[in-house]
Amino acid sequence: AAPLAHAASVKQEIPAQWDMEADVVVLGAGGAGLMAACQAHDRGAKVVVFNKGGSSYHTGTNLCGGLFTACGSRMQKADPKIKDDWKAFADDIIAYGEHMSLKEPVYGFTKHSGEAFDWLEDHGLAAHHLEPYAGHTNVRAHRQDSFKGRDYIDVLEKEIKARKIEVHHRMPVVKMYFDEAANRVVGVQCGRDGKFINCRAKMGIVMATG
């Protein structure tokens, strides 16, 4: 996170010519990044993903023990004993983080978490179940029967390949290019060991770096 914060804080001269461009640039190829890439693609965007690690299987999602907390999924709604809502879910997350979280991204996640889990189910997610989990006032932990986070990555990798979305591994972000006139980040430089790519992001950048 520190190198990325440094990259974002230093004014960078925008390249006169880009090496490549996409509508949406996703940084990070774990569960959040690959899901974002699929969703942007399905809404008509050209997407490219840059990942610091060597594989999507070298990410936090793969190491999560097959756990996905979600509110409003089909599985949760099917249990009549569970009465849950996105605001209660958000309150649990914010309390667990000692009220230091920004509410907007937490609300965005909790409102759409059930929909996201249903999407994984619809695209072939392996067997799973519901269970209680520490810090949550309701039963919303969806756990893979395998206890392996790679079940999620398996689904997402399959869908990324089906959509022919470019994923560049071992390509950490080292610069962000900010256009003062447009008042937004318009591109990134990714790479290492003297080999770098300047990629324009015509619509935006998704930060999913953990």
Where are these regions (language model features)?
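Short beta-strand "acidic-cap" motif of Rossmann-like dinucleotide-binding folds
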Residues: K46-N51, M207
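Beta1/beta-strand and adjacent pyrophosphate-binding region of the FAD-binding site
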Residues: A16-A32, V48
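Generic hydrophobic/aromatic pocket-lining and core-packing "Φ" positions
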Residues: L34-A37, F117
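Short, well-ordered coil/turn residues at beta-beta hairpins
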Residues: G28, G191, M207-T209
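Aromatic pocket-lining residues of Rossmann-like dinucleotide-binding sites
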Residues: A40
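Core beta-strand elements of the Rossmann-like FAD/NAD(P) dinucleotide-binding domain
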Residues: D19-A22, D193-G204
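N-terminal twin-arginine translocation
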Residues: A2-I14
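Conserved N-terminal/central alpha/beta ligand/cofactor-binding core
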Residues: E13, K52-E166, R170-K175, N183
